[in-house]
Amino acid sequence: MTSRIVLTYEDYAALPHDGKRYELHEGELSPRGAPSARHQLIIGNLYFILRVHVVATGRGQLFLSPFDCIMSDITVVQPDLVYVDESRRPLISERALEGAPTLAVEILSPWSRHIDRGVKMRLYARHGVEWYWIVDGDGLTIDAHRLEGDGYRLDARLEGTTPRALPPFPDLPLDPAAIWP
């Protein structure tokens, strides 16, 4: 019988800085592929829109990947975009966010689709991420999921061409034309 080796944050932090990206999912090392140009354009557009709003309102901090979110000693993730509201600001350290963000955003890629909708959705729920956006650049949708109990419920969807606010930013209508390249 083979026993599973469970890696910790200490093991993760000791990985060589060779340009490769990894996450730690419940003690198991998970490699991350390089994002596509479209992925980067979408996340850049979304970051710009949200950043202007967050700075103007003074409500929290926004981070782009790669940025570690240390959920536990055996779970470290790097969402594409992370929002931390004022109540969670004390969790921000020099090295990482040491706990769950208010919002985690993932842009679906062909290689990450099953991970973002499965493994990461469960990890985010287990560790108390209040909001989880799944951005589908092919379907031109953003699904805003709200944590309820031990899982997520679809709370709102941005689709089509009409601007719409998504939680946790009820006062920020997102214009699809400004997001999709």
Where are the regions a protein language model picked out?
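Gly/Pro/Ser/Thr-rich low-complexity, intrinsically disordered segments predominantly at protein N-termini
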Residues: 1-181
